[in-house]
From Swiss-Prot:
Pfam families: PRC_RimM, RimM. Coiled coil: none annotated. The keyword Nucleotide-binding does not apply. InterPro entries: PRC_barrel-like_sf, PRC_RimM, RimM, RimM_N, RimM_N_sf, Transl_B-barrel_sf. The gene is rimM. This is Ribosome maturation factor RimM. The PRC barrel domain binds ribosomal protein uS19.
Length: 173
């Protein structure tokens, strides 16, 4: 199966004719109109953004085949995905979150720490979540200082843990 990337989430209905609020996760919010049909997380449904206009922090979008408020309301919370190969190539030092998930994580000495489980953003910057083979996950700032090496082709990231993590000794990840 081709890797897919979540590019948008449908929000509440807007108006009476089936428009929806659409939160995009792309650099250019309007790019979701150019990807063609987008699929739901389970792949069971295809939805195409036929028209969109900018609102304060989201888009107001018309989805092909969605013509009533009731239909739009049923889509609230639906995540929309596109095949990874439809996305533009990234510049040096830029990554799609989907490309990082599953990479092996090592410390600077080469000791395995686990795998990249997720990338989060709770409003103060990106957080990289590392899942070790055993024990709780580790969440660290996704900065150049903490993650100095991202080698997608080599399937790994290097983590240089901050001096203290929850009161533990420096670099004792």
């Amino acid at each position: 199966m081709t890797a897919r990337v979540c590019v948008a989430r449908i929000g509440a209905a807007h108006g009476l004719r089936g428009e929806v609020r659409l939160w995009t996760f792309t650099e250019d919010p309007m790019s979701v109109t150019r990807y063609g049909p987008l699929s739901t997380k389970d792949g069971a449904r295809q939805l195409e953004v036929s028209h969109a206009r900018a609102a304060s922090d989201h888009l107001i979008a018309t989805l092909t085949g969605v013509t009533t408020r009731e239909e739009a309301e049923r889509l609230n919370g639906t995540e929309l995905y596109v095949a990874r190969d439809k996305l533009p190539e990234t510049d040096e030092g830029e990554f799609y979150h989907a490309d990082l998930i599953g990479l092996a994580a090592f410390d600077a000495a080469g000791t395995a720490l686990g795998t990249v489980a997720a990338i989060h953003n709770f409003g103060a910057g990106d957080i990289i979540e590392i899942a070790p083979a055993r024990g709780p996950t580790l969440m660290l700032p996704f900065t150049d200082a903490v993650v100095p090496i991202v080698d997608i082709a080599g399937g790994r990231v290097v983590i240089e843990a901050p001096a203290e993590i929850d009161g533990e000794e420096p670099n004792s990840v």
